[in-house]
Amino acid sequence: MPNFRMTLSYDGTRYNGWQRQGNTPDTIQGRLEAVLSDLLAQPVEVAGSGRTDAGVHARMQTASFRAKTALSAPELLRQLRARLPGDIGVLTLEETAPRFHARLSCRGKTYVYRVWNSETPNVFERRYVYALPQPLDTAAMQRAAALLCGTHDYTSFCANRRMKKSAVRTVNAITVERLGEEVRLTFSGDGFLYHMVRILTGTLLEVGLGQRDADTMPAILAAHDRSAAGPTAPARGLILWETRYAHTHPEVGEEKRE
């Protein structure tokens, strides 16, 4: 059966995250599967590179699915674009290697968190930024961010207290930059735990507000305790920016990280 790979972007504001929930179409995965199943007259299951939470957006999510169809990939792309709502956009669609799987083949992700750091409201971007008018010390935030990079057990930055799998992840880089009145945090790594990027962001914002010292980051990591870290930043400021794959797709074997 042909295997298809697609990249898409979406505004997550009105969706209950990526993952399907029963028969509701109010998830990105649920909406894609409903449209594809209707278009191709067969049940279609769509796999994503990971599960974005309710209210989180994506600039470049990668998904894959298998389906029997006489439609070419360009025609399937055209038909899919015509049927999806305006807040879900398919950027590319192609037939791919039989063993490619959007989640299992994924080798890394980049997330961006946007903070509107101004007393002046940003009306047209309000669904895509976290408005925080208090001044932020971005230099202190960057010092703290550097201490959070590397390969660590990130239990303190995970909202799933019952997680039985390893919480060890590799975070390659965290950058904090000011772009006018916006403070942008960028996180790149091999995978992230449940709410991990938002908890990292909330902790770094506490540093920026002077509520926590940058040098306490190693102690938070060592605590292996969610209560040691800062709050979970709101979903609306988070964007799945990029997903990364090997040029040649490896054999699918072990379960990959979110």
Question: What are these regions, as identified by a protein language model?
Answer:
Residues M1-E258:
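Structured-RNA-binding interfaces characteristic of tRNA pseudouridine synthases
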